[in-house]
Amino acid sequence: MSKFLVKAPAKINLFLHILGKNNNYHSLESLLVFVNIYDILEVTIDAPRSGVYFTNLKINRYNNTITKVIYLLSQHSTSSVNVFVSVIKNILVSAGLAGGSADAAAVMRLLGNVWDIQPQVLEELALEIGSDVPACLHSKTLFARGRGEDILLLPDLCLPKYIVIVAPKGKPLSTVKVFNNYEPSAFSSPICDNLPVRQDDWLELIYNARNDLLDTALKFVPEIEEILFVLRKFRNCLIARMTGSGATCFALFNELSDAEVVVRELQMTRPDWIVFNAKIL
């Protein structure tokens, strides 16, 4: 029996464009970053039994992204044994931060290494778990397109580092619900053939981009609009935007001190919001 402790970082979509829909899946383009907010997973390999335990949330223990990973990878390994995972959830659930996908990817990386499963196989299996899982396998700044499987890593992209994250308390938002109700008058045009090369061009793209799911999310959580309005008023806020399918929003800053001012003020004045700062990895 072997025990491992792994961390699963939260994801932020700096922008998210929807290009169309094929075979019931939306095609997208998104710039993703990962931040220093982590779920902590204790993974026991060759445990007395397989299973998943969430220490502080009522998440289905028998049908979740981690159980799916354990099952899928066991089918691709001759050395598979019982795996038990205990999860401390720090990433907000149903909030657009890819917590479930991050957990799945963390377990996938570990088991892939221990069971000697090739990275290409892991990437193919990741998409079966969820559209964010391939990106979470990397957990680095990247540009994703298609269903999320077409990934371009951007190791040299230097972005503003400090993020204030704000979510309305008690208002989870289902990704499936948002996508199922997404009915645009027109889809976004692709940018993948004209990706920026220079640093300044990437920053300009980020500033001028958007989250195409915002209007749909607002139908279910109108408070998102107020959060964005408040964030945009703060000094030196570069952008304020919703991440993923919501309802979490973020504001981007160059300086930690500016982000800390926002967090202090909102934690004092908005007890109805969850507010914390983070840093891009």
Swiss-Prot record:
Catalytic activity: 4-CDP-2-C-methyl-D-erythritol + ATP = 4-CDP-2-C-methyl-D-erythritol 2-phosphate + ADP + H(+)
SUPFAM superfamilies in UniProt: GHMP Kinase, C-terminal domain (SSF55060), Ribosomal protein S5 domain 2-like (SSF54211)
Name of the protein: 4-diphosphocytidyl-2-C-methyl-D-erythritol kinase
Family: Belongs to the GHMP kinase family. IspE subfamily.
EC code: 2.7.1.148
Gene designation: ispE
GO molecular function annotations of the record: 4-(cytidine 5'-diphospho)-2-C-methyl-D-erythritol kinase activity; ATP binding
Keywords from the UniProt entry: ATP-binding, Isoprene biosynthesis, Kinase, Nucleotide-binding, Transferase
This protein's pathway: Isoprenoid biosynthesis; isopentenyl diphosphate biosynthesis via DXP pathway; isopentenyl diphosphate from 1-deoxy-D-xylulose 5-phosphate: step 3/6
Source organism per UniProt: Ehrlichia ruminantium (strain Gardel)
Active site, renumbered: K11, D132
PANTHER family attached to this UniProt entry: 4-DIPHOSPHOCYTIDYL-2-C-METHYL-D-ERYTHRITOL KINASE, CHLOROPLASTIC
NCBIfam families the UniProt entry points to: ispE, PRK14608.1
GO biological process, alphabetically ordered: isopentenyl diphosphate biosynthetic process, methylerythritol 4-phosphate pathway; terpenoid biosynthetic process
Role noted for this protein: Catalyzes the phosphorylation of the position 2 hydroxy group of 4-diphosphocytidyl-2C-methyl-D-erythritol.
Binding site residues for ATP: L92, V93, S94, A95, G96, L97, A98, G99, G100, S101, A102
